[in-house]
Amino acid sequence: PLVSALAVMLLYLSIVKVITHWRGKIENFTDVSVVFGGAVIGAMTFAFTDSHWFNAVEAEVYAFSTFFTAIVVWLILLWNEKADENGNERYILIISYMIGLATGLHLLNLLTIPFVTLIVYFRKYKFEWKSFGITMLITAVIFFVIHNGIIKGLPKIAASSIGIYGTTLLIISIFGFMIWSVLNKQNLLSIISCSIVLILIGYSTYTMIYIRSNQDPVIDENDPETLESMISYLEREQYLSLIHISEPTRRYS
């Protein structure tokens, strides 16, 4: 319930920022009523929706996942306000870490990536079809790197002939490149490399599953003790595939 309440709070703050950006600076009571009243109505409507309410009261991943999604949205809107200030990159970095933590919980947060890149694009550039297309291509690359490269790729690399030691060396190399880019003041490269490292640090929470499973606890679903079983666990193979049929096999009255 706590993280669900925090998600509602972050939604309220995000709506305040969106309305303020649209209407401009708050100057009178009417502005106060529209901005804060609209944000309260929007946040409370979401709070009492059936899906969010029942996610809040059950022990599942969706409440935390919603919280991480809400905080990423709020952070990029906060960055939008401070994009011209020195040190605005810190918001991009904390967003990267939040995405890493979130993917260690549920993949829903990956859907915030297009939102983040579009906010950055419209804040920094004037709309043109060519630049917009390039932005969409970059968005797809970022999604592919995180989903296929880090989330699915690293475990498969570790299970391949390269092994755990080779994967560890690869991760150390990424850390080394990050340090080099920061020390040599390569601004764009340092932001990219730091973001990748922060995503890796956040995603590393999955190692807890692997370590805990090897201790053979009483409840050990899917038993991800080996790299092969861990890959199966990460790819959600236990849920099988959904078979679509034209007619329902069971009808409800």
Q: What label would you give each PLM region?
A:
Residues I19, R23-S33, V72-Y91, L118-W129:
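Membrane-interface transmembrane helices that cradle and orient dolichyl/undecaprenyl
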Residues G42-M44, Y91-L105, T139:
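Membrane-interface alpha helices of multi-pass inner-membrane proteins
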Residues V8, Y12-V16, D50, T69-E81, ...:
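Hydrophobic transmembrane alpha-helices
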Residues I243-S253:
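Single conserved hydrophobic/aromatic residue that forms the stacking wall/gate
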Residues N80-E81, T112-I196:
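Perimembrane helix-loop-helix junctions
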Residues L2-L11, V16-I19, R23, T45, ...:
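Transmembrane alpha-helices of multi-pass, membrane-embedded glycan-processing enzymes
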Residues S51-Y62:
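Short acidic/glycine- and proline-prone juxtamembrane loop motifs at membrane-interface regions
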Residues V35, A39-F48, F143-I150, L170-I174, ...:
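Transmembrane and membrane-interface helices of multi-pass
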